[in-house]
Amino acid sequence: MFRASKEKIEKGLNFQNVMLDKFNEHFKNVVDSRSYIMKLKPDEPEVVYNTFESKNGDIIIDDIHLECVTVAKSSIFPESKLRNFRGKKHYYIFRLDDTEETFVVPSYTWNCYMKKCKKIPKQGRMYRSFKASHIKGLRRKKTLDTFIQTIKGE
């Protein structure tokens, strides 16, 4: 099974924490999904928490589900995320490593785009390869601030 480097894991968790703080500045009902399910079901195996998070994202704001993703210039994206993270109010939040820009993309848009990208097997799992610059070219992307204003109804 593919294991991300410690540096990549820390970068992703740091980005997720930054996003939690940012959304907490603007909204009342911001939930870290893993913490939430662990409080509800404290003695479950790790797979239960992983499954919940894969379907609900990293952050939940009311009925909006957000999955935080840090992106290198050339990256891979897990097929399992394409299968599990979907719905009208599911969004990916991408932070581009090279420019430090942050964009929000509806899961439907991203999942459709990813299906056009090359499949890559890696240690028993399937991934799709893509470039960070492609995120900038998506018509349905929003900047983080614009996305927050949209949710707030401003």
Regions found by a protein language model. Give the residues of each.
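Nucleic-acid endonuclease domains
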Residues: 1-154
